[in-house]
Amino acid sequence: MSLGCLFGALSYACYFMSLSNFYRMEYWPGTRPAQEPTNIQLADITERTAFHDYWWAGIVIPHAIQQCFMTFADLFILERLASRVVESLTQSVKIRVKRLSTAANVIFFLLNLASIGLMMGCGIYNIFAGHDYLRSSAAYRSGDNFTGAQFNVDANHFNDLANNVQGVSCWLRHEPCNLH
């Protein structure tokens, strides 16, 4: 239980760090917060690359770590709670069935393992989506007419995993994203 609380505290620490970086990102150089506080336009390749690094290091990676910590917290806390609940139930009816406790622990473990797999799958998807970003950067350096990336962010959906994946993916492809 104490390990679960520790992982939970680390999880929320990572969450607030990524959230603060998210709001700080709105005032990244090159934005126009007075007119469009959630619209980020980056026309220069150097600035766009710096923004890309900041987005991953300051927001996406801490958010992924937060999800992992939360998963481990769930794993330790729910396993302990499940075993105690099952134990109390079996004692109340004078039936000691340890298999029920083991089955509950296995179910909670598989559910948390599935959530980790989901996070890893989204990360792999975002990595493979980056080839358009690199190709566009090369086109910009070669002198092609390349407009800056647009990334519309809705803060209300920051913690929504689907919107995060969609937002990062279309930002890497330099397409406008409307997350509502």
Q: Which residues does each predicted region cover?
A:
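Extracellular-loop-to-transmembrane junctions of the mid-late helices
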Residues: 66, 105-180
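Membrane-proximal first intracellular loop
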Residues: 1-102
